[in-house]
Design a protein with these regions (language model features):
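Basic, flexible Lys/Arg- and Gly-enriched helix-loop patches that mediate nucleic-acid binding at interfaces
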Residues: 6-298
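BZIP DNA-binding basic region
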Residues: 2-4
């Protein structure tokens, strides 16, 4: 009689590469260090797990024990698809970025960096931990979302979250409907096609800062545009392509969060309803697919 085939015992599931997180990300999240600072600490053998020093580029489970200089780094809650809490308890602030502020932490050419601008409101220590969700160039102003939790920055800034960036733009001459149609249809820029989701003149009920409503500029010089991504100087380049250089640019909305009555330099925690809308957007966002591994040649 033929010998019956034996089935191999089921193998225990080991964490896949996509389940694991780079150790420098975990160290940055738990310690408040920048990603570069975490890399420096790891390279100096100051970070350990289970009694051994971790290596640069190593990946660990999100709850793996970590110590920095012998002190335990407590694990923080991470977003969970099962719980639907994509923000994972992270605090998110709405801030009116003034003109002249560079949204980086260190820039030899910056007049005012992000931490310097936030120190009067948050204190130097907390201001140094704040990260911007997306960016606004130095000469632009308006709504910028901020958080201390690095893990939520990329999901909220990525175009697949579907969070519109809304702007009020001032130009020397009035933008006509034919030009708005060009913005909505799409324009080829140096880095590819770009288009406005919405482009039109401003309305009486648009959420605009008080100094815009009562300013010296003719209301006809202002227009409203929303886009679905945050490429470098994208709005300015779109207006430049229709021969209407932007004189002043104010971001008035980011997804469900509005600039509202904030004045330059002011910040507030986002409301519970804004938070829920951001969470819904992240839950609904298509998840990135893991890249297939190419077969090894034989």
């Amino acid at each position: 009689m033929p010998t019956p085939m034996r089935r191999a015992p089921p193998r225990k599931r080991t964490p896949q590469l996509t389940d694991l997180i780079r150790v420098n990300v975990l160290v940055a999240e738990r310690s408040g260090l920048s990603r570069r600072g975490a890399d420096t600490a790891i390279a100096g053998n100051r970070v350990t797990t289970a009694g051994r020093a971790v290596a640069l580029g190593e990946r660990l489970d999100a709850l793996a024990p970590l110590e920095l200089d012998g002190k335990a780094l407590a694990a923080k809650p991470r977003p969970s698809a099962e719980s639907g809490d994509e923000l994972g308890g992270a605090e998110v602030f709405a801030w009116y970025k003034p003109i002249g502020v560079t949204t980086t932490h260190a820039d030899p050419y910056a007049t005012v960096t992000l931490p310097q601008a936030l120190t009067p409101s948050l204190g130097a220590e907390r201001a140094a931990r704040m990260l911007s969700i997306g960016r606004l160039d130095r000469e632009s102003e308006g709504l910028l979302l901020l958080t201390e939790e690095r893990r939520v920055v990329s999901p909220l800034a990525h175009p697949r979250a579907g969070l519109r960036r809304a702007y009020a733009a001032a130009t020397k001459a009035m933008v006509g409907e034919a030009e708005f149609q060009r913005l909505r249809a799409g324009i080829r820029l140096t880095d590819g096609w770009a288009h406005a989701i919405e482009a039109r003149g401003v309305h009486r009920d648009d959420d605009l800062p008080e100094d815009v409503r009562g300013g010296d500029m003719d209301p006809g010089q202002w227009s409203f545009i929303s886009i679905g991504e945050g490429r470098h100087h994208e709005v300015r380049r779109l207006y430049g392509a229709i021969s209407h250089p932007v004189l002043r640019l104010i971001r008035v909305g980011y997804g469900p969060v509005r600039l509202g009555g904030l004045t330059p330099g002011e910040l507030r925690l986002i409301t519970e309803s804004e938070r829920q809308e951001l969470t819904r957007a992240l839950v609904a966002a298509p998840k990135s697919k893991a890249r297939p591994v190419a077969p090894t040649s034989r």
